[in-house]
């Protein structure tokens, strides 16, 4: 695990799975109401600069996709460990620039900064944020979205 939080999640997962439960690992759920997105939009709309990590990957999901999957797990009375993720990663800087363009703001207001492990509570910067969904795609007949599709769905 890359952080204390991740270590605690792993321990919790073991307890749940050892008791016949269900664990669904999610990557990052994003919406227009996500605090970071709202903050960036407000600042960019006010012609103010924002900082975005250029070395930190994100694997965005939208809430509708997550809810659809949870319903399928319930309907099949499934047990065990499942993962939800888009097919590909995107960097925070790319989301910020995309948002700037979407709201007709100046992309030059987006500053590229490097995430430092200590500042984000990690032991190291992860190379990838995606999770393998091969089993979930087969077992539940779902299509893993691309990050671009997720961002389009949430209006970014």
Label every model-predicted segment.
Residues 69, 76-122:
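Mid/C-terminal beta-alpha module of Rossmann-like enzyme folds, strongest
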Residues 37-41, 63-74, 144-155:
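Short, amphipathic alpha-helical "lid/cap" segments that border enzyme active or binding sites
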